[in-house]
Each structure stands twice: as C-alpha cells, then as structure tokens.
Amino acid sequence: VYMQDTYFAQVAEQTVSNMFSNLDLTKLSKVAQLMGSMSEGRCFSMYSFDEATEKTISDAGFTAQTPSSEEHPQAGVYVTEQNPSKMGWYIHRTSKITRSACNNDGSQTYHVEYTMTNTIDDNQIGIAGAAGTYILSVNADQQGRGVEKTLIYAPAGGSLTNLQTSGGTVTGSRQETLNGKTVYASIANIGPGESVTYSFDVTTSIKAVSDLTLSLI
C-alpha cells in the first residue's frame, strides 16, 4: 500500500511540475482557466502558510472555503473517506434541493436530501480483491464498506434544522464548532449496495438574492 501511495504521489508531483514548466502566454491562459473551473468544482485547492501569499491565493478563489456568502447561499456537505482504502471510488453521491417556503422576512427555506450509495457489488469485490487490501480496505472488518466522515454546514447568516438520516449506519452524530462555525458531524458506514440519506431543512439569510446551492466535497 505504501509503495502504491508513493507512486501516486510521484505522479501527482510530476503532473503539477509539467503543468507549470515551459510556460508561454497561451499555456498560462489555459492553466488559469483550468484552475478556475477546477477550484469552483472543488477539484483543485491551494493553501500557503505564508499569510501574504495565502491572501493572494484566497482572493483569487483558489483556497477552498466553507459557505461565506449571505447573498448567494450555500449549504456545505463535506465528505472524507475514513476507511483506508479506495472505496471512495464506489460511493455515488446525489443531492436534491426543494424550496419549501418564501418567508415574510425575505429569507427562503429549502428541504435538502443528500444521498451516498455504495455501488460496489459481489463481482467487483472479487475483482478488486485480486489487488489485495489496497482497494477494499486494509481493515478486514471494513472491506468493501464506505466509512464516510460527513460535515454539514448551514449557509452564512442562515440556519439548519430537522437533520435526519436513513439507511446504512450513522454514528457519532454531534453538533460542534469548527473555526467559529457550527458544523453537524457524523460517520456514515455504508455496506455494499446500501445507501445513506441525510435530510434537513435550510433557511437562508434575509440578504439572499439567489437560490440555495450546495458546496460539496
């Protein structure tokens, strides 16, 4: 496993090196466009421990942030695979947002459903198993399972209520504060063919001028 991780790290390092080598105006323009679209989709993020450099990076939109705009509300749903495996490849994620109320104060209320489905089947488990524990998990009791740490944020200036889960096994549900913001944390353990759905209601700030969207990882 460690040798494979080292290999992927070397590939990533070489890819980034090639991306920024031999830059001309045409290549620089393409790289900038790609970085912008990837950062919007949270496929690319940068952070610097130098405060001045980080401010420049953050102002350019390249540092991933939790929801911060009251005018353009986003609820954050951030998922991190806790099973030492490559099971994240098999976890299919879908979301649904339904407006449920236009409130007198100008805020909007929405119902949100976020579902994670473990799509791996017995045939795929057999194929993946041939690669050893690298794909399915180094932990024998978790092989083929998605173990998803899930953090849910209300939109800036808004609120989140009626959080419920269904399907699979969800443990460690708690409300805590992270970097000054309220976050709803839990662990979803999803077996082969199983799904876990998080459902909750979101009310935006009265300053909202656009519909609710989700900020996802």
Predicted regions, residues:
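Lumenal/extracellular ectodomains and adaptor appendage modules
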Residues: V1-I217
